[in-house]
Amino acid sequence: MRKYAILTALLALMAALSGCTQIIMGRAEIDKLFIVRVFSFDEAEKGKARITVTTKDLSTGEGGEGATQKGESVVSEGDTVFDAARNLSTYLDRKLNAGHTEFILFGESIARKGVLPYLDLISRHPEFRYNAKLYIVKGDTANSLVEKANTSKYFVGDRLARIEEHIGRTSISGMVTLNEALLIFDERNLDTFIPYIEPVPT
């Protein structure tokens, strides 16, 4: 009986270790993830939806001080925002991770027609952080803002973060998080409010 008990215990231990191995193997390495820092939504041609996901390129490049911190972006389009989201995986060479999204940008045309379908998509995603900040890009597309900001050595997410640091002096309104926006849209007695960013020529 004792031998059977030892054998049973060993089998149980092997099964447990096997389960742990599967859990560990299920985790993606950091270099296998496309960690999104900025999500951008726009209206594309013929009424299609466009999504741009941007991550921070941490490559040091050459020269130390001249290290690049630009963003890497992937663009996807679809007949609806849900189609565009599904199509993202076909353009990514890594697994998308939205758990570190800091900023969500909307092009002006999207804002005028309504951002609810986009907020619905975001709120259904299990990884999105509800403290991510929302902005509308006035007079332009969100994708265009990201592309312009990433032509320099600074990452667009870092630029947006610097704007927030000085929001009391440079802005006429405060920040709105994803959680606050969802509460605003859910409450009939509250006015809809999302701050905007207006690109200026340099």
Describe each region flagged by the PLM.
Residues 2-202:
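Membrane-proximal alpha-helical signals and transmembrane carboxylates
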